[in-house]
Amino acid sequence: AGWTPLHIAASAGRDEIVKALIAKGAHVNAVNQNGCTPLHYAASKNKQEIAIMLLENGADPDARDHFESTPLHRAAAKGNLKMVQILLQHNASVNIRDSEGNTPLHLACDEERVEEAKLLVSHGASIHIENKEELTPLKVAKGGLGAILKRMVEG
């Protein structure tokens, strides 16, 4: 399976085309050769209106690509704060792990995405989950981010 018209429109940020395709019955959870759904691309490229349309029409917020990454992994790594909020509002799993054992919080910490990391923790992201390298998000965090997150959790 390759890219569907919905994948292309979502990736390109074409709101009206996405809306029309959904209205015509396009499969919102279609996967391409990388295991990605249109929502993976909307999340990655910070296409907020498109993500909302997809989610409101049944897109799975926890869809996994071939690396077991979800749209939330992508948004957290890219530093798309509003997208992280949108996905969390639509019940994206906050402690879901990719093929390397990383949670979205690991990726946010690794990329120094302070606000995204704080938002994930405030929604229940664990600072204690170890990835395959036995690193927690706190060990991956750079600068003072680890201390900030630890204070949030431990008070």
Per-region residue spans from a language model:
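Ankyrin-repeat-protein effector appendages
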Residues: N57, H90, S122-G155
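Conserved ankyrin/ankyrin-like repeat signature
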Residues: E16-I17, E49-I50, K82-M83, E115-E116, ...
